[in-house]
């Protein structure tokens, strides 16, 4: 992966993990996501969060990252999913909407179903945030992922349509990162959420620009 793609490929993961980054402005990224951002900002102001700015995206249109005073961040995807990142040692703001997913930093114990995202975690040296994989060790083309599974740092937890609920619940999975295939198995999403495991679908495959798919 060339230097430009390395810089772009992980902006959403950067936001998710609370790493430091910046992107360049682009009018291409201000279309479909603008309404979601405005809705998020209105809701978050009501929750006592003070808006400071947003991550500038060059190509991607299907997600947003907004910054708030105190180190809080709100991630949004095109389906309306909102994830609030709470800084270490801080509390969840009062009055937060019941549909907002809350993650505490440092983020850990993720269940990664969307295999294409693994390379982004690798490039950002953030494999330690992943605890569960929907791919078996022998099926990974990414050497670091194979090694992590061989050493037990990442565990196989079943495919998207047949996750090992017992394992991921027992080991306190914090978030399932799915691809669009999960839309064909809504009962799995419902079951995960029933067990208290929030679900986020990554929509990089819908990005119009090739670089938007890796941003």
Residue positions per predicted region:
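Bacterial Sec-exported substrate-binding components of ABC uptake systems
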Residues: 22-118
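Charged, glycine-enriched surface loops/patches
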Residues: 185-215
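Sec-dependent bacterial lipoprotein signal peptides
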Residues: 1-20
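A short, structured surface patch at a secondary-structure boundary
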Residues: 73-169, 175-182, 197
């Amino acid at each position: 992966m060339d230097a430009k793609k390395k810089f772009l490929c992980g902006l959403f993961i950067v936001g998710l993990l609370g790493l430091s980054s910046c992107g360049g402005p682009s009018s291409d990224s201000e279309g479909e996501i603008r309404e979601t951002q405005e809705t998020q900002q209105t809701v978050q102001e009501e929750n006592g969060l003070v808006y400071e700015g947003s991550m500038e995206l060059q190509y991607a249109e299907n997600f947003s990252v907004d910054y708030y005073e105190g180190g809080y961040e709100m991630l949004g995807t095109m389906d309306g999913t909102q994830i609030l990142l709470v800084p270490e040692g801080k509390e969840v703001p009062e009055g937060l909407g019941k549909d907002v997913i809350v993650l505490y930093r440092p983020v850990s114990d993720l269940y990664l179903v969307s295999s294409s995202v693994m390379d982004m975690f690798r490039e950002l040296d953030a494999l330690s945030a992943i605890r569960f994989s929907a791919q078996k060790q022998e099926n990974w083309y990414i050497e670091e992922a194979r090694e992590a599974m061989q050493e037990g740092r990442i565990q196989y937890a079943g495919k998207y349509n047949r996750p090992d609920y017992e394992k991921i619940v027992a080991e306190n999975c914090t978030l399932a990162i799915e691809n669009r295939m999960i839309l064909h198995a809504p009962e799995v999403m419902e079951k995960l959420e029933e067990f208290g495991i929030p679900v986020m679908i990554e929509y990089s495959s819908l990005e119009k620009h090739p670089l938007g798919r890796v941003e």
